[in-house]
């Protein structure tokens, strides 16, 4: 399988997943979001080089503010289908209230559907201040960003990511 074939297949699989999330969300069925937290772990491990990434909700049911974390490499993820600025602000408020910055240097908000074109960095900076750095251009990611990151990998890694997406 050549690179172009893998990338095309990845795009098809991810676009189906995004559509499923959008439709489930419109129906008020949020179970797909919870299932995706676990399903995305091997993909995020590969893309972000986080071998110890795990679901924090397994540690504590409904872990507040963040869903996935790698305490060794100090990276956390909030996985959500909500794409508005308020969701990001709420996540950051909880992150700082719970002092997660003492365990995690980076936080990504992973939108399961297409993110907005932009988010107010000024609004975010008012929350984070000097306590924590969060850049809306790099730390708010969506399936398009996942595909872009995957396209920079070797074809063997892309195949592994494609395999994981097909399992979802």
Residue ranges and their predicted role:
Residues 32-96:
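Catalytic centers of nucleases
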Residues 23, 27, 51, 71, ...:
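A near-ubiquitous, low-amplitude feature marking generic local secondary-structure context
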Residues 10-11, 16-24, 59, 68-69, ...:
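Generic ordered-secondary-structure signal
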Residues 1-55:
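Acidic-basic catalytic patches of nuclease active cores, encompassing PD-(D/E)XK
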Residues 1-10, 82-168:
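Acidic metal-coordinating catalytic centers involved in nucleic-acid phosphodiester chemistry
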């Amino acid at each position: 399988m050549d690179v172009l074939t893998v990338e095309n297949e990845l795009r098809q699989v991810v676009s189906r997943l995004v559509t499923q999330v959008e439709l489930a969300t419109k129906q008020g069925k949020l179970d797909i979001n919870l299932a995706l937290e676990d399903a995305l772990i091997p993909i995020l491990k590969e893309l972000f080089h986080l071998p110890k990434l795990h679901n924090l909700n397994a540690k504590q049911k409904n872990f507040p503010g963040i869903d996935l974390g790698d305490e060794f490499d100090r990276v956390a993820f909030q996985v959500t289908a909500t794409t508005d600025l308020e969701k990001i602000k709420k996540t950051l408020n909880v992150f700082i209230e719970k002092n997660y910055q003492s365990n995690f240097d980076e936080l990504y908000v992973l939108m399961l559907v297409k993110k907005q074109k932009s988010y107010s960095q000024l609004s975010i900076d008012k929350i984070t201040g000097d306590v924590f750095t969060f850049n809306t251009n790099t730390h708010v990611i969506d399936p398009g960003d996942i595909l872009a990151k995957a396209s920079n990998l070797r074809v063997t890694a892309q195949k592994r990511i494609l395999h994981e997406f097909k399992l979802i």
